[in-house]
Amino acid sequence: MATGTDQAVGFGLVAVSLIIFTYYTTWVILLPFIDSQHVIHKYFLPRAYAVLLPLAAGLLLLLFVGLFITYVLLKSQKVTKKAQ
């Protein structure tokens, strides 16, 4: 059974994910259909960032996955050399 702290952290992560999903969905799908002079546009970044931010996040994810795999492979090679 998860502790209270684990449940709170999990709930917080889900809440943040839902907020980001709602914001991004509104930004990308609904905002182009709203008049550009409407006051809601001041709460969103320019549309170019709708592509650049996920692209940057994806590249960072690939970078960290690659670094992790490299670290694990190098560490396992050191352990293999010690055993021999």
UniProtKB/Swiss-Prot annotation:
Pathway: Protein modification; protein glycosylation. GO terms for molecular function: dolichyl-phosphate beta-D-mannosyltransferase activity; enzyme activator activity; enzyme regulator activity. Component of the dolichol-phosphate mannose (DPM) synthase complex composed of DPM1, DPM2 and DPM3; in the complex interacts directly with DPM3. Component of the glycosylphosphatidylinositol-N-acetylglucosaminyltransferase (GPI-GnT) complex composed at least by PIGA, PIGC, PIGH, PIGP, PIGQ, PIGY and DPM2. Interacts with PIGA, PIGC and PIGQ. The chain crosses the membrane at residues 11-31, 49-69. One of its GO terms (cellular component) is endoplasmic reticulum membrane. Pfam families: DPM2. Regulates the biosynthesis of dolichol phosphate-mannose. Regulatory subunit of the dolichol-phosphate mannose (DPM) synthase complex; essential for the ER localization and stable expression of DPM1. Part of the glycosylphosphatidylinositol-N-acetylglucosaminyltransferase (GPI-GnT) complex that catalyzes the transfer of N-acetylglucosamine from UDP-N-acetylglucosamine to phosphatidylinositol and participates in the first step of GPI biosynthesis. May act by regulating the GPI-GNT complex. Keywords: Endoplasmic reticulum, Membrane, Transmembrane, Transmembrane helix. Its main location: endoplasmic reticulum. Belongs to the DPM2 family. This is Dolichol phosphate-mannose biosynthesis regulatory protein. GO terms for biological process: dolichol metabolic process; dolichol phosphate mannose biosynthetic process; GPI anchor biosynthetic process; protein glycosylation; regulation of protein stability. It is a multi-pass membrane protein. Changing residue 23 to S: Abolishes interaction with DPM1. InterPro entries: DPM2. It comes from Rattus norvegicus. It is found in: Endoplasmic reticulum membrane.
